[in-house]
Amino acid sequence: MLSTGTKSLDSLLGGGFAPGVLTQVYGPYASGKTTLALQTGLLSGKKVAYVDTEGGFSPERLVQMAETRGLNPEEALSRFILFTPSDFKEQRRVIGSLKKTVDSNFALVVVDSITAHYRAEENRSGLIAELSRQLQVLLWIARKHNIPVIVINQVHFDSRTEMTKPVAEQTLGYRCKDILRLDKLPKPGLRVAVLERHRFRPEGLMAYFRITERGIEDVE
């Protein structure tokens, strides 16, 4: 298990992010998805393959998190191998290339987010199949190297159910055995994580956390 650095989230996930498994982390803007992925990679002590499709990866934020935790910021930055595909086609190429990039020196793969370029495409016919293929490649990497893969996802409003749901819910749900939803709460900095699916933990469990300079911390 790869620790998130917080007791509450580790407990919620059954010890942390599971190796050999795709974990979907989804939620609205600024709910803590990227911070959670950065912190998990930072504390792993090993290399992280980070596919940033939204421009959300912030070296400054990573440095801040490292410094406030007494870690070497330059060493931390050097461990994050960043990929920035500009469209869905390039995303396909980048994810395919990870099969050669990721080796035993890597502790984690993050795709942030898997659906941003998919949503930007005008003609989505056939793209669901391609999205499924990309997820299959990520699952192959997770299993081959026995490491976690965090797949960050966006949300959309479903007018039929009048609820916010993850984008491409069925496609991601088929491949992702663990699903974690993050939400903002009225109190500034406070967030809640809801376990929507897990291989052995009960669904619906919740954990509260704060977003601070250090990253994500337990609520005291």
Curated annotation (Swiss-Prot):
SUPFAM superfamilies with a match to the protein in the record: P-loop containing nucleoside triphosphate hydrolases
An individual GO BP term: DNA repair
Cited PROSITE patterns: RECA_2
Residues involved in ATP binding: G27, P28, Y29, A30, S31, G32, K33, T34
Pfam families recorded: Rad51 (PF08423)
Keywords tagged on the record: ATP-binding, DNA damage, DNA recombination, DNA-binding, Nucleotide-binding
Disulfide bond as UniProt keyword: no
PANTHER family: DNA REPAIR AND RECOMBINATION PROTEIN RADB, RECA/RAD51/RADA DNA STRAND-PAIRING FAMILY MEMBER
Protein name, entry field: DNA repair and recombination protein RadB
Organism of this sequence: Thermococcus kodakarensis (strain ATCC BAA-918 / JCM 12380 / KOD1)
